[in-house]
Amino acid sequence: MLRIFLRTQSVAAALIFLFACHGQAQDLRSPADPAWSVPQMGALPYDPAGMLVRRGHDLITATYAHIGPAVADEAKRYAGNNLACSNCHLNAGTKKFGIPLWGLKGLFPQYSFEAGKEISIEDRVNSCMTRSMNGKPLPVDSEEMKAFVAFIDFLSTGAKRGETLSGLGAGKMPELKRAADPVRGKAVYARTCAPCHQLDGQGVLRDRHLLNFGYVNPPLWGPDSFNDGAGMATLIAFANFVHFNMPNGTSYTHPRLTQQDAWDVGAYVISQPRPKRADLDKDFPDRLAKPADIPYGPYADGFSQKQHMYGPFGPIRAAIARLKAKKN
């Protein structure tokens, strides 16, 4: 049911990488303007620049085979799990509302509330590496980083600087007035998600003896999944991604899960055990800029960790708005 990864920070561009940011997804009710079409990689020349873009595509679609924890060259073991970036950035980052990577070249550098400073596109890639991929940062001057950035830049072909293209993020469905229910979500998971991701959430390996072959269907929790600092570990990101993309192959124009089912199954999945990221208390140094569904403290609003995890989020946002008004 789920090809995974996400979290957005401040603007729609931050809704981009594998499993790590937080912020603003586009509202599906907004006009689909400006339009965008996928650049064709086959039209690229086989020169060094074209080959670097192709290398970036390979890294997105088969991350585990190039920089995963089981690759032969230990110096290349940057990722800490055997996922692929395209588990979350569907169709190699080209699917509308499948957390696409298009149009991002002109949106960086940008301010990140999570980091509390301006970040580059390379910083954003490394946020995914350390959160969604549960690994370590790529050197900025490494071949792999240059290839990632070259592919993202290629997907921005034709986009104007500062232009937010239609389809970024994972969509935006109405939130529940109640808390999402992980108990009900468990039943939804068993019925809808387990056929692909297994009842224990551990996914399906291509070869159980060769982890660097990756997964047919990725794990949604457990030691080889994204960590608790990733964007997919937050309910709003996960539930919207599921509603508009899952089971795999679903189009955002014809969701197969109801909104209620998506919220509840999201609550179930994010409640499951996964790797722990250190120093999460340092995220969002401005506590009033912390999104309502970040499932780890500290918080400035007085609400419980449980409500930040499952909602409802409206009362949290209202409290934050009051605190901001008082501060100003």
Label every PLM stretch briefly.
Residues V71, K96-W102, K160-T164, L205-H209, ...:
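Short, solvent-exposed loop/turn and secondary-structure capping segments
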Residues P273-L280, P285-N328:
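A cross-kingdom marker for long, charged
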Residues H66-G68, N87, A92-G98, L155-K160, ...:
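Secretory-pathway/luminal and periplasmic proteins that interact with or process carbohydrate-rich
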Residues L2-I67, Q110-P182, S304, M309-N328:
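Post-cleavage N-terminal segment of exported redox proteins
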Residues P48-A92, K177-N217:
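Sequence/structural segment immediately N-terminal to covalent heme-attachment motifs in c-type
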Residues H66-A75, K136-D141, R161-L165, T253-R256, ...:
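Surface-exposed patches in mature extracellular/periplasmic domains of secreted proteins
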Residues G50-R54, L59-I67, N87-H89, T94-L138, ...:
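Extracytoplasmic electron-transfer domains, predominantly the class I c-type cytochrome c fold
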Residues L165-G167, L199-G214, T253-P255, L280-K282:
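Short acidic alpha-helical/loop segments enriched in Asp/Glu that coordinate divalent cations
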